[in-house]
Amino acid sequence: MVILGIDPGSRITGFGVIKVQDNKIYYVASGCIRITEITTPKRLKQIADGITQIINIYAPTEAAIEQIFMFQNPMGAIKLGQARGVAMCTLAINNLEVSEYSAKQIKQAVVGTGGAAKSQVQHMVQSLLGLSKKPPEDAADALAIAICHYHSSKSLAKISGASRVSQKRIK
């Protein structure tokens, strides 16, 4: 199984790709899609193009994305929602089923506490994947999303008789 994690953002969208084989997690790739365009439609297209390129290179079999969180600034929430929507649509266009996780779920799965700091997430991602250095924040978050998805799907698979459809309902 190859899992693509996406940490959507209006300026930087992080991505992380892991491979799971024999219940072991292996690092494949990670990075950031840095948005350089000025107009909103071109910014959103840049996100879609970047994710499409990642899908074409790494051929993920599953995808996961962070759920939207509360914003004090309504415009910030709208921009993040647009980026997230484009990311989810691009994944769906490429026939990837998309699972969603809250920031708390992701931190809990990777660090062991839902209130973990960004630096703790970076450190645990580095440790779990055997990386020589901490990945950048957005890439670390995306890798953490992929790791969370693996742990979540592994746990759900243990539930006797849980099909892919019923697993989605359990969430």
Swiss-Prot record:
Cellular compartments annotated: Cytoplasm
Coarse class of the protein's main subcellular location: cytoplasm
Keyword field contains ATP-binding: no
Gene3D superfamilies, sorted: Ribonuclease H-like superfamily/Ribonuclease H
Record-listed E.C. numbers: 3.1.21.10
GO molecular function, one term: DNA binding
GO terms under cellular component: cytoplasm; Holliday junction resolvase complex
Record note on cofactor: Binds 2 Mg(2+) ion per subunit.
Listed SUPFAM superfamilies: Ribonuclease H-like (SSF53098)
Keywords assigned by UniProt, alphabetized: Cytoplasm, DNA damage, DNA recombination, DNA repair, DNA-binding, Endonuclease, Hydrolase, Magnesium, Metal-binding, Nuclease
Required cofactor names: Mg(2+)
Enzyme class: hydrolase
A Gene Ontology BP annotation from the UniProt entry: DNA repair
Active site, UniProt feature: D7, E66, D138
Catalytic activity: Endonucleolytic cleavage at a junction such as a reciprocal single-stranded crossover between two homologous DNA duplexes (Holliday junction)
Annotated positions binding Mg(2+) 2: E66
Binding site for Mg(2+) 1: D7, D138
Purpose of the protein: The RuvA-RuvB-RuvC complex processes Holliday junction (HJ) DNA during genetic recombination and DNA repair. Endonuclease that resolves HJ intermediates. Cleaves cruciform DNA by making single-stranded nicks across the HJ at symmetrical positions within the homologous arms, yielding a 5'-phosphate and a 3'-hydroxyl group; requires a central core of homology in the junction. The consensus cleavage sequence is 5'-(A/T)TT(C/G)-3'. Cleavage occurs on the 3'-side of the TT dinucleotide at the point of strand exchange.
Family: Belongs to the RuvC family.
Subunit structure and binding partners: Homodimer which binds Holliday junction (HJ) DNA. The HJ becomes 2-fold symmetrical on binding to RuvC with unstacked arms; it has a different conformation from HJ DNA in complex with RuvA. In the full resolvosome a probable DNA-RuvA(4)-RuvB(12)-RuvC(2) complex forms which resolves the HJ.
HAMAP family from the UniProt entry: RuvC (MF_00034)
Name the record gives this protein: Crossover junction endodeoxyribonuclease RuvC
